[in-house]
């Protein structure tokens, strides 16, 4: 009887041990048998990936040990999470923290650029709330870092990083008027850039075709970019011109990088307007020449032949001097209206970048309105609205701005598909949607985004990799992950390596692609099955979990981390080649 009892006790102990082992597997997630593209650009391998906490724990063939969650990735591609190098989810993530349009494409890091959500003066906060569109929210922060803190506290699925806007800093000190800073004001602007860098900015950013940013001269930008470089950051910029004065605009970016010591990224690399499509070779040669001289220049792009912005890009900068309210007031004056109308009809102005001139009324598609009475015009071209209102397209554009009380969201069809196919293959090119991160429900259905909001990255993989063979999958993954991560000096992100953050995408390379169109833009992409962000599921079996997996990803001068703080010069930092 004693022997039986002892045997029973031993058996019970073994069973209990097995149950404990089953309850506490060594890993949180194991991804098994996938074709792994590690983000470095090297050839893929078939291995398992184990995740523990927010980090990758192990990568090897046939890993022993189970995960609390197991993903069978046989026949699937596994890669680092994609980096949206130019994103505008500033407001959309406040309304819905999932960012589903990008999440469904495998984006795990949204990088805010062109402007920033801080630092703000009380007047800037007031105007920001006054100018809000469909999404209403209180502006509760004032500092650059305060906005990132707010997002983290609210809860978001994607990681979010941000540059500090040169235009934001300019408005902080100078307002929205066409004025130049005094030496004391410029020093104060530099101080705001330094403060933002130490609060986590990745660098300095600008959009030089828009007012009031366009009022800044090159020396001002060099002075601000120098602070970014001293703080380990880069300079990202929508160039001052993308059509007739493209060469001069690219040269300005090169000059700023060379003089400041800050690496520069050219936003949405393009040649706008049919007459400029032949300039691609010259533009590429300028970048390659600068890089050969060890001036660090890179670029990013979206994968569509139309851009999306506002009707402010169709009108001269002088009429916009002082901000939106003064712009609208000037448009109501008959003399100003006539002058604007005449200047809009000049496709080759010398002092501003006329996107309307490159697209024409038929190539200007209306996407987003603030005024509910104008929303039925969504999806129509400017030419169609002009016909309905029985006036010229230029007058229609002016009236739209006045009636809507906003810049009005539009798409401009200006680029060449042949050029785009060459651009995606450039080795120094990464990718950005230049859009918000909406979700196809609720308030987001009140307007039409550009389809790139839902399709930019899936289109790269489906159309330009699988269908056209313009670049290989391993190269595309590298330039969605490891390449931009290195350019941004991100620590522990962009590659699949033990010890790195577990931002991981599992997708089907045979089916991944976009579904969004200009007429039906609110359609999520297909082919991405699972997305881990910081080791937790943000997308599982194609469905958003709603989990708050995201964090603020801050630059290397952030004083909240060991070794933070700005340096005496750019030479005190290590830079990506």
Regions found by a protein language model. Give the residues of each.
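Divalent-metal coordination cores built from histidine and acidic residues
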Residues: 73-78, 82-83, 87, 93-203, ...
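Histidine-rich, glycine-flanked metal-binding segment
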Residues: 23-27, 36-81, 96, 514
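Divalent metal-coordination and catalytic microenvironments
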Residues: 34, 49, 54, 75, ...
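Active-site neighborhoods of metal-dependent hydrolases
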Residues: 148-151, 156-159, 163-183, 187-210, ...
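Bacterial N-terminal signal peptides
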Residues: 3-18
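Divalent metal-binding pocket/active-site signature
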Residues: 195-253
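C-terminal cap of metal-dependent C-N hydrolases
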Residues: 34, 333, 422-428, 434, ...
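Acidic, glycine-enriched loop/beta-strand segments at the rims
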Residues: 36-48, 407-415, 419-420, 468-478, ...
């Amino acid at each position: 009887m004693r022997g039986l009892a002892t045997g029973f006790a031993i058996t019970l102990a073994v069973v209990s041990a097995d149950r404990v082992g089953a309850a506490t597997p060594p890993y949180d997630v194991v991804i098994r048998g996938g074709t792994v593209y590690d983000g470095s650009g090297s050839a893929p391998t078939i291995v398992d990936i184990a995740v523990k906490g927010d980090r990758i724990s192990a990568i090897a063939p046939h890993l022993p040990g189970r995960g609390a969650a197991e993903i069978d990735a046989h026949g699937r591609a596994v890669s680092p999470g994609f980096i949206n190098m130019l994103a505008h989810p500033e407001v959309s993530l406040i309304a819905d923290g999932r960012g589903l349009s990008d999440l469904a494409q495998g984006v795990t890091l949204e990088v805010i650029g062109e402007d920033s959500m801080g630092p703000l003066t009380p007047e800037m906060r007031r105007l920001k709330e006054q100018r809000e569109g469909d999404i209403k929210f209180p502006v509760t922060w004032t500092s650059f870092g305060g906005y990132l803190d707010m997002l983290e506290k609210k809860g978001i699925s994607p990681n979010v990083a941000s540059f500090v806007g040169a235009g934001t800093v300019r408005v902080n000190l100078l307002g929205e008027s066409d004025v130049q800073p005094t030496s004391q004001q410029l020093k104060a602007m530099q101080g705001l850039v330094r403060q933002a860098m130490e609060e986590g900015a990745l660098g300095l950013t600008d959009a030089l075709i828009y007012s009031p940013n366009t009022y800044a001269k090159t020396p001002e930008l060099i002075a601000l970019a120098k602070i970014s470089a001293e703080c380990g950051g880069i300079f990202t910029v929508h160039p001052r011109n993308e059509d007739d004065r493209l060469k001069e605009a690219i040269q300005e970016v090169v000059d700023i990088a060379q003089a400041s010591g800050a690496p520069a990224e050219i936003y949405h690399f393009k040649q706008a307007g049919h007459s400029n499509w032949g300039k691609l070779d010259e533009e590429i040669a300028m970048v390659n020449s600068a890089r050969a001289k060890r001036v660090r220049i890179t670029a990013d792009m979206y994968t569509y032949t139309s851009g999306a912005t506002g009707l402010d890009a169709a009108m001269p900068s002088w009429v916009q001097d002082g901000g939106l309210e003064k712009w609208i007031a000037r448009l109501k004056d008959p003399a100003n209206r006539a002058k604007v109308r005449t200047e809009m009809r000049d496709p080759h102005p010398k002092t501003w970048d006329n996107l309307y001139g490159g697209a024409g009324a038929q190539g200007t598609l209306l996407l987003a309105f603030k005024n509910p009475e104008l929303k039925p015009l969504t999806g129509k071209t400017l030419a169609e609205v002009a016909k309905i209102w029985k006036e010229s397209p230029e007058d229609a554009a002016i009236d739209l701005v006045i009636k809507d009380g906003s810049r009005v969201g539009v798409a401009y069809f200006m680029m060449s598909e042949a050029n785009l196919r060459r651009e995606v293959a450039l080795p120094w090119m990464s990718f950005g949607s230049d859009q918000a991160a909406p979700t196809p429900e609720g308030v987001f259905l009140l307007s039409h985004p550009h389809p790139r909001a839902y399709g930019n990255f899936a289109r790269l993989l489906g159309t330009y990799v699988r269908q056209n063979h313009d670049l290989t999958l391993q190269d595309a993954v590298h330039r969605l992950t490891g390449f931009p991560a290195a350019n941004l000096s991100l620590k522990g992100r962009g590659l699949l390596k033990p010890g790195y953050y577990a931002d991981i995408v599992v997708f089907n390379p045979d089916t991944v692609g976009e579904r969004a169109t200009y007429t039906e833009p609110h359609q999520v992409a297909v082919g991405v099955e699972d997305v881990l962000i910081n080791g937790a599921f943000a997308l599982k079996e194609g469905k958003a979990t709603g989990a708050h997996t995201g964090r603020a990803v801050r630059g290397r001068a952030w004083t909240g981390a060991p070794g933070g703080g700005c340096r005496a010069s750019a030479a005190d930092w290590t830079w990506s080649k």
